[in-house]
Amino acid sequence: MNDLFLTNYTDETFLSRLKQCFKRCVSFSLSVSFIKKAGLILFEREMEEALKRGVKGRIITSTYQNFTDIESLRTFNEWQRKYSNFECHLDHVCFGDNGYHSKGYLFEYDDSLEIIVGSTNITRFALKKNIEWNISLVSKESIDSYNGAMNNFEFLWERTFDLNEDRIKQYSILLDYAIEKWDMDYVNPMSQRVVPNSMQRKALKELRRYRDTGVSRALI
């Protein structure tokens, strides 16, 4: 069994490894909580080339924290129409209060198996810049870690929704009304810091004074 530690700064990066996996695999199963088009596009070509070769591909992603974007889901839905060997499932509060937060990449090759697990979601920052840790295990024989992950993948697959146009529309409406919507991949690092005006500064000062005296509620 071979093992690798993968980051954005190791000799072989997580992204470069992922691209090689798609070039060699005969099947892949991905369970990734957060997927952004700006991240997906970094290896989209390799992934679609695998599907064109007839590789069986499955992905589970999630609406958890409203992070996955509509563009990625539309890409996956288009692939489902184009390739009978590709399927995508969507977690939308399928597990109640248990947030869907996995990052697992399973690949089957002609002569071996590979599992990559760690912290990396499919976002541009996660794949190019962030400090991320991932472990890859490759074995020519069946190993407990791969089997356990695949069993859990099947469990999750049976309890999540088929991705379709109606679910994408429902999620799009949810995003339009969402209170929390933050997209690191598109944050402008040069954007100006928000500074309170004079009236807001006075209100914040009064709130601090109330907190200091033990008051927990106030009207502004």
Question: What spans do the regions from the language model cover?
Answer:
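PLD/PLD-like phosphodiesterase catalytic module centered on the HKD motif
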Residues: 1-209
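Walker A/P-loop
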Residues: 212-220
